[in-house]
């Protein structure tokens, strides 16, 4: 299952990327948290139909 990861850098720039599976999502989020350069990180599931699920916030400063 695919996931979309949304994030905001500390300077306010917002961006997003897609991950192929939960393992890739978790590794990317873990790396982002360890870097300490973000003020917002969230993810949501992308279903096979193309619909997005509920957004889950990981970091919100």
Where are these regions (language model features)?
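Low-complexity, intrinsically disordered short segments enriched for Gly/Pro and polybasic residues
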Residues: 1, 21-22, 46-47
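Short aromatic-glycine-(Arg/Gly/Cys) micro-motifs in beta-strand/loop hairpins
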Residues: 1-13
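A short, exposed loop/beta-hairpin motif centered on an aromatic-Gly-Thr core
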Residues: 11-24
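Helix-centric, low-specificity signal for extended rod-like, repetitive segments
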Residues: 18-19, 28, 38, 48
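Short, surface-exposed linear segments at secondary-structure transitions and domain or protein termini
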Residues: 23-33
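Short, mixed-charge low-complexity intrinsically disordered segments
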Residues: 33-61
């Amino acid at each position: 299952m695919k996931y979309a990861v949304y994030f905001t850098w500390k300077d306010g720039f917002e961006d997003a990327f897609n991950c192929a599976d939960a393992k890739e999502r978790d590794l990317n989020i873990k790396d982002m948290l360890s870097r300490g350069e973000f003020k917002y990180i969230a993810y949501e599931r992308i279903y096979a139909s193309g619909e997005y699920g509920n957004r889950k916030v990981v970091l919100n400063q």
